[in-house]
A protein has these predicted regions:
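Core alpha/beta catalytic barrel or barrel-like domain that forms the active/cofactor pocket
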Residues: 172-197, 218-234, 296-298
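Short, internal active-site loops enriched in acidic
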Residues: 54, 146-150, 224-226
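Bacterial Sec-dependent N-terminal signal peptides
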Residues: 1-13
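Short, conserved secondary-structure transition motifs
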Residues: 138-154
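Aromatic- and acidic-residue-enriched segments that line the glycan-binding/catalytic groove
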Residues: 152-169
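Active-site neighborhood of phospho(di)ester-bond hydrolases with catalytic His/Asp-centered motifs
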Residues: 102-103, 143-145, 218-221, 670
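Intrinsic-disorder/low-complexity accessory segments
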Residues: 10-110, 114-138, 193, 199-201, ...
Length: 832
């Protein structure tokens, strides 16, 4: 392989260790782990660390490789890299470049791990003069598989279905994975969209380790469709303007070096197309916004390629070919890092020093108001910590003037001691800017992912972007005292309802057989106002706990950091007493979630993860093919994630589902599942755009040649209907349980043009788009015109049951924190 390979009698090659030539079959994860352990036990210049484990218990590994001299001082090298990233120490002549190679974040892009074994071997091979020379001024970290659970799902499938010889016909069984495929992790999350948000166990452990090293160069290895040539940097537009000229320049240098080796072999490749650098949570952009040179490398193949597959041009793409390509770019990248080591270290140092002394962008501070929602504020603070962003609370300035994210205006506001204050004059100000800027500038509207993600909208917290620097007054907020055990025996305990933590508290109470109620209307007692949605835990009905009732409730509150109000009477000062029918009992729901072929594994996984890992609340997952087996008498809530449903197209199955709803069931339909209901007789209709039709007809009559468009402009024309992910302002009816806990406005991440007609006759329009609801992110001209005056979130009453429509996904990638309460309302409060 391009002169990189040489014999070594000490360290076994992958072929020797595995007992088969690399590329003739896919290697299970445990054998990959065994090989890395063998190399670490044999070679003197490699250190192996297990930095974590997956949800299914598989080890997550990283191999650190360097020259013997560098390995002898590896902790000093790591610490100096960390100091540079914190603007605490400048470059020195002996600091090597840390190159981090991440393989197989998408499980069914399974060539990457095979290539990682070959790369490790050549780096520790003393007989390879090239790699040993490169290691004099580089330290290479290899993570052979970021997603072992997903990869094992694919490898097991392929090894179980292939024949004695690989079948190259792509319609054969071995080239067609069953649902959900191996791309995602155990909970079907795309780990390559989770770097910044760190919602998944694998991401949390990996990024924590990454941030202990802060490498100067990071490569994320992928695969794409079978017919695609190899892709490597430089990336496509749009580039976020936080990316520096040097970062662009080094991408070009590395790309040219990769091209040199590909040209020698006559291999096809492309650059500067398709894969942009904008969304902040990729394996290339996250390192970029943290000072490194981040790159994605994409080999043609992926889950349908198997060991060998026939391409449309008649060539056979083999696993051996794919390994060779990824191995070559791995080595080529390390080569450039070695050649440019001094410049890379110098620019890396300057990056963080400049970020601290002169932060980019017009805003120099951000203030996030607590506003009575310390739980959400604490959740945001935790995300900032995970991303090395410094912050504090309160300020010596009593007030300031800044851009209000919610009103879109510059306003004067007060700064309270509980408010979170972030000063941009810090080493990680570029990441701060990317996550907080109200509107990110797009240099090209053709992009690969969502185009808006500002955290104040994602968390639903009133925030201000300030052009002047503000210094936090304290590193931590005032300590919240635990709820004390009352000496008296209160009539009831009251708990707020406005954050995920409140839902976790409710989940725990219900599972411990505590009877909980909530109020449908506001009330006042003891001189304090309580909004609709407030949880009420009365002593009456909970006598089974006996003398332990008070101790149990307060211990639960302290576990979830919930502040309780104890009241001595059910007689309120204003509003409805606790015996009123406006005080609703919360029945512990039995929840069923559908999955299976045709249903979005991502959407289903987000819900599954939400119940199991965030709420710790039981849920039954059923394949849609097996809905006839559901015990409908034991099912209170049925959730339909985004997807296509055969049962909704089948009249008998659909009628059975309607009967269940009429008898008291609650059907929650998300995204395209809601659209499928609109296509049937469910009393829900997609919004018709008669005005747009008339406008188009008028345009044709007045401009008859309007339809004559150049073929070369077809991509630009198509994005007129495109909405990859933009933020819209939703007006809420906060008197309905679906919107309890909100202040009247919800910010949604809109990813399609679906909007529903306002409902009448037993329908409640809880969340609607009115005119001028757009806030930020790219929206095609035609789609933007459509997105007004329609329903996004609603409840349709049907007999004794309800249908909850959630046109947008409130659990998107689990980072849209403000949507979690909306979804929880649909599960726990609606219809009670």
């Amino acid at each position: 392989m391009l002169g990189f390979l040489a014999a070594n009698a000490q360290v076994p090659t992958p072929d020797q260790f595995l007992g088969y030539p690399l590329g003739t079959q896919f290697t299970p994860h445990y054998r990959v782990v065994d090989y890395f352990k063998q190399v670490a036990a044999t070679a003197k210049n490699v250190k192996l660390e297990q930095y974590g484990a997956t949800y299914e218990g598989r080890p997550l590994l990283m191999a650190i490789v360097g020259s013997p001299e560098n390995m002898a001082r590896i902790e000093e090298i790591r610490q100096h890299s960390l100091d540079m990233s914190n603007a605490k120490g400048g470059a020195n002549g002996s600091q090597p470049v840390i190159v981090w190679l991440s393989y197989n974040v998408h499980g069914n892009e399974a060539v990457s791990t095979e290539a990682a074994m070959q790369a490790l071997y050549e780096l520790v091979n003393n007989g390879n003069a090239q790699t040993q020379q490169w290691l004099k001024n580089t330290v290479v970290i290899i993570d052979p598989c970021l997603n072992p659970d997903g990869r094992e799902r694919y490898v097991n499938f392929y090894n179980n279905t292939r024949g004695v010889k690989p079948n190259v016909n792509r319609w054969s069984r071995e080239h067609n994975e069953p649902w959900p495929g191996g791309r995602a992790n155990h909970y079907y999350f795309d780990l390559n969209r989770d770097w910044a948000w760190q919602t998944q166990k694998e991401s949390q452990q990996r990024v924590a380790k990454y941030n202990q090293w802060m490498p100067q160069l990071h490569v994320d290895f992928h695969e794409q469709e079978i017919e695609a040539p190899y892709y490597f940097a430089p990336a496509a537009e749009p580039f976020h303007d936080a990316i520096t000229p040097w970062q662009r320049q080094l991408q070009v240098l590395i790309g040219r070096n990769n091209a040199k080796y590909f040209d020698q072999q006559g291999w096809l490749y492309f650059t500067k197309e398709r894969f942009d650098l904008f969304y902040p949570s990729y394996g290339d952009t996250y390192p970029m916004y943290n000072g490194a040179i981040g790159m994605t490398y994409e080999q043609g193949g992926s889950g349908r390629a198997g060991v060998a597959v026939l391409k449309k041009d008649g060539d056979t793409l083999t696993l051996t070919d794919r390994i060779a390509h990824h191995f070559t770019t791995s080595m080529s990248t390390i080569e450039v890092a070695s050649q440019q080591a001094e410049k890379i270290i110098s620019e890396y140092t300057q990056y963080f020093e400049a970020a601290k002394k002169n932060p980019q962008g017009g805003y120099k501070s951000y203030v996030v108001k607590a506003g009575g929602n310390t739980e959400k504020l604490n959740s945001l603070a935790e995300l900032l910590r995970k991303n090395n962003i410094a912050f504090g609370f309160g300020s010596n300035a009593a007030s300031a003037s800044g851009f209000n994210y919610f009103t879109g205006k510059t306003e004067t506001f007060t700064i309270d001691k509980e408010d979170l204050v972030i000063n941009a004059f810090q080493p990680h100000s570029n990441m701060l800017r990317v996550l907080f800027e109200p509107v990110s500038h797009l240099t090209d509207s053709v992009t690969y992912d969502i185009t808006a993600w500002a955290l104040p909208y994602a968390y639903g917290l009133t925030s201000f972007a300030v052009k002047a620097p503000l210094t936090p007054a304290a590193d931590a907020p005032a300590v919240r005292n635990n709820t004390p055990l009352s000496a008296q025996k209160p009539y009831a305990y009251l708990a707020q309802w406005n954050s995920l933590r409140d839902v976790k508290f409710l989940s725990s109470l219900l599972q411990n057989d505590i009877k909980v109620r909530f109020t449908e209307t506001p009330f006042s007692v003891g001189g304090k106002d309580f909004p609709a949605g407030t949880l009420i835990i009365t002593r009456a009905g909970n006598t089974a706990k006996g003398d332990q009732f008070d101790r149990f409730i307060t211990s639960q509150a302290n576990q979830f950091k919930i502040s309780l109000d104890a009241v001595a009477s059910g007689f309120v000062d204003k509003g409805m007493d606790f015996g009123s029918d406006k005080i609703r009992f919360i029945k512990k729901p039995h929840v069923t979630l559908l999955g299976g072929r045709g249903i979005s594994s991502l959407g289903m996984g987000e819900i599954w993860h939400f119940f199991e890992q965030q709420l710790d609340f039981p849920i039954t997952v059923v394949d849609e093919r097996n809905t006839d087996d559901i015990d409908w008498d034991q099912t209170d809530v049925l959730i339909l994630p985004d997807g296509d449903y055969k049962m909704l197209a089948d009249k008998a199955a659909s009628d059975k589902l309607k009967e269940w709803v009429k008898n008291g069931g609650r059907l929650i339909a998300l995204e395209s599942a809601a659209a499928e209901l609109a296509g049937g007789e469910w009393g829900i209709k997609l919004k018709k755009e008669e005005e747009d039709k008339e406008a188009k007809e008028k345009a044709v009559s007045t401009r008859p040649y309007e339809a004559l468009k150049p073929y070369a402009n077809r991509e630009r024309e198509s994005i007129k209907q495109f909405i990859p992910g933009a933020i819209y302002k939703v007006q809420l009816d906060t008197t309905h349980p679906l919107a309890f806990g909100y202040a009247g406005i919800y910010y949604t991440l809109k990813q399609d043009a679906n909007l529903y007609e306002f409902m009448e006759n037993g329908g409640w329009n809880v969340g609607v788009l009115k005119k001028d609801s757009y806030l930020s992110g790219f929206v095609g001209a035609d789609t933007r015109q459509q997105l007004k005056d329609g329903l996004l979130f609603g409840v349709k009453e049907m007999g004794d049951g309800e249908i909850v429509i959630l046109a947008d996904n409130p659990l998107f990638r689990s980072f849209w924190e403000n949507g979690k309460l909306l979804f929880s309302n649909a599960v726990f409060l609606v219809g009670q």
